[in-house]
Every structure is written in C-alpha cells, then in structure tokens.
Amino acid sequence: MEAAKGITLNLRELGCPGESIATMIHGPDPCYDAPDTQLSDAVTFLRVHHSAITLVTVDLGFNTLDVCLRHRDIDRTCVSPQLTLLRRQLTYVMRDLTRAAGPHVTFIGVGHYNPYLSFSTKEGSTETFAANSVAALRQMNRTLAEVYGSFKVPMADVATAFHEEDLRIVRRPHKEATTVNVLYECTLTWMCAPKPYGPNIHPSDAGYAVIAKAIAVLLPPNL
C-alpha cells in the first residue's frame, strides 16, 4: 500500500511469536537472549534512529488475556485481574517507547479481533464459550484503546474491520446458514480451516491485508 504511494519503507521486525507483554519486558522468549528483550531492542532501535521518519505498530494484549480463555472456557475470575495487569504492563511499554522516540515517529496501536466467534456455530459449551468471549474481547479492546489514548496514540479498529458486530444471517447453497461476522472470521483467519492448517487463531493472508488497511487509515500524510 505504501509502495503504491511512492513511499519506501524498510521493515525491522521485532515481534516474537507467542510474546506476552510480560515476556516482552522481562523475557524469556525464543527470539531474544538475555539480557536483551524485545522491549530493550525496540528502545535501542528508536534511539539509534532518533531522527528518522519511523512508523511503529504495537500489537500486544491478546496473549495476556488468552490465559483466561484456554480450554474453550472462560475463567471469569481471571479476566479483570489480567486486564488490570495488561493496563499496567502496556503503560510501562508505551512509556519506554515514547520516551525513546524521536520527533518523527508515529505510533499506532493495534486492536484485536475475536478468533472464537466461529464456535458460535457449534452447540453446547463451545457455543456458550463463543458468546462469553465477546464481552472479554470487548473489555480488552477498551483497555488497549484507553492506554494508547493516554499516550495520544491511535488504535487500529481491527474488530470493526473484521465485521464482528454484524450478526446478519447468511444463507449459502449446500451449506449451513451462518452470520456475517463468522463468515468473515472464516475468511480472514484459519479458525475454520481443516487440519493441519486449522483451527488456528492467526490471520490468513487476507486477514493480514485487512489489518494493514485498518492501520493505513490512521497514517499521517508523510507516510
């Protein structure tokens, strides 16, 4: 998308699969050797490139909350404490990043889609789990937006980009009826894919493209 506008970006990927905010701050993780952490490398990068025009996307939070949603059940006593922890840890991360950033750095936070909506098509406990996950993910996105907003950082609305609130019924030939939001989830993630590819909570190529567009609408004119 940026290339189409004549803008050349050099990517520095600092993310690490399965990273929580806690492991980003303190380690350990499979991507960094102590004493380095993802956060320390990000701070160093920003200091070294202090005068550069830089875009930083921050995609954190889901793995901190997901400990409450494992085993296709929701531990309601877990959600509020984890969101309190998320708020405190993300504030710590954003404080370090913004202090290290130069005058030409743009930060964009990334909200999250709910990867469990497709379970609403199954009867029993998984259907209940899908319904209960909606409130938990909404709470998480509100918490993320509040923290990013306290640093004057916009947040890409990925949940809206994935049409999560669209509950209209879709009737398809030779297939069970479903809802628009579930249809989007099946297209934009691997949750409805057969083994060995799914079910997997991560985005498909189409999903990553939708997330990129949600970020792109927040970019300043120089990017």
Q: For each predicted feature, which ranges?
A:
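A structural motif corresponding to the C-terminal end of an alpha-helix
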Residues: M1-I7, Q89-I108, Q139-D157, L218
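Conserved SGNH/GDSL esterase-like catalytic core that processes O-acyl groups on lipids
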Residues: M1-R88
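Solvent-exposed loop/turn segments at secondary-structure junctions
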Residues: G15-A22, L60-V67, P103, H112-S118, ...
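Extracytoplasmic/secreted proteins, especially bacterial periplasmic and envelope-associated proteins
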Residues: T37, D41, C78-Y92, D96, ...
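Short glycine/proline- and charge-enriched loop/turn segments
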Residues: D73-T77, K122-F129, T189-A193
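Substrate-gating cap/lid alpha-helix
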Residues: L85-R87, L117-T160
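Aromatic- and acidic-residue-enriched segments that line the glycan-binding/catalytic groove
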Residues: D166-L183
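Histidine-centered active-site loop/cap adjacent to the catalytic His
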Residues: T179-L223
